Amino acid sequence: VKLYGDISDEQSGRIFETAKSEFTRLDSLLNRYSSKSEIYRINESPPGSIRVSRELIDILKRSFRWRDITDGLLEPKIGHLVELWGIGSGTRKIPSHTEVDSVMKSIRESRLNIIDDTSIAITGDISLDLGAFAKGYAVDMVYN
């Protein structure tokens, strides 16, 4: 994090610590690889209803909006495709067209519905990865 402007070292230190704290908090909510995050818990859950935080509901709604705006390019249910390519695992690979088609079919068939302010329902084999969206959201939250 780089800070620019006419601010004291004390102010910049406070701003940096606040930003770091917010990034850490959001990582604990949205990191699909951390067993302590809500996203990880959803990805490991069987189909059915799941209780989640109000903040995650808001984030999911925003991610769905961006999925629609981008005609599916920012798909929050892309986790299995990320796994297929080995992204984040240290062993990346190029999957076959057949493998990609199979995973894409699973993504299209799975559903995540928001029930209320603290519940979602999943059907099918869902694997969320908010990746790019989460990074942008985190920067927005720190900026605010």
Where are the regions a protein language model picked out?
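A contiguous, well-ordered beta/alpha segment that forms the leading edge of an enzyme domain
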Residues: 1-130
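Cysteine-centered nucleophilic/redox motifs
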Residues: 132-144
